[in-house]
UniProtKB/Swiss-Prot annotation:
Coiled coil: none annotated. InterPro entries: Flavodoxin/NO_synth, Flavoprotein-like_sf, Flavoprotein_WrbA-like, FMN_Rdtase-like_dom, NQO. This is NAD(P)H dehydrogenase (quinone). Its cofactor is FMN. The keyword Nucleotide-binding applies. FMN binds at residues 10-15, 78-80, 113-119, 134. It comes from Methylorubrum extorquens (strain PA1) (Methylobacterium extorquens). NAD(+) binds at W12. GO terms for molecular function: flavin adenine dinucleotide binding; FMN binding; NAD binding; NADH:ubiquinone reductase (non-electrogenic) activity; NADP binding; NADPH dehydrogenase (quinone) activity.
Amino acid sequence: MAKVLVLYYSSWGHVEQMAKAVAEGARETGAEVALKRVPELVPDEVAKQFHYKLDQEAPIATVEELADYDAIIFGTPTRYGNMASQMKQFIDQTGGLWAKGALVGKVGSAFTSTASQHGGQETTLTSFHTVLFHHGMVVVGLPYSFAGQNGVEQVKGNSPYGATTIADGDGSRQPSEVELDGARFQGRHVAGIAAKLAG
């Protein structure tokens, strides 16, 4: 049985919803799944002023625990085509793990949310993949065997690089069912590969 960590940052809850779907998909394989988040860097008064979702139940992860999992699926909103600073700050603390090769051979994957359809989803995911490659992880995306990422009949996220959702500029759009299905698929896919690699 693979041990999977779904680790995310979410300002307004879109990535949180996707993270829960990813975790749900991973659990369907029989994996032992933990759902955690990285610390918030925005001061409380600012977060309240901008209506951040402050009631997220997932516990805060520690950098050291990343080595305990067979797979880590990272979720982050997009900030100018890159991961959010909260996630980057957490990742930047993994130098000790890198020095020990603690994540080499583990499965790594990522998912994201953007305000618009062309708001940097794929650049965020591929830049995240670069981090995973530096750690020696086996990078897994969202294959085209997930048919929900095909077609143009509706506005929707998802790409071969990972599950995605589109929040709209004011955050009013919530993840659609096909986007959540993509997240579940990615969770199942990553957990299945991790189980095979873990033996």
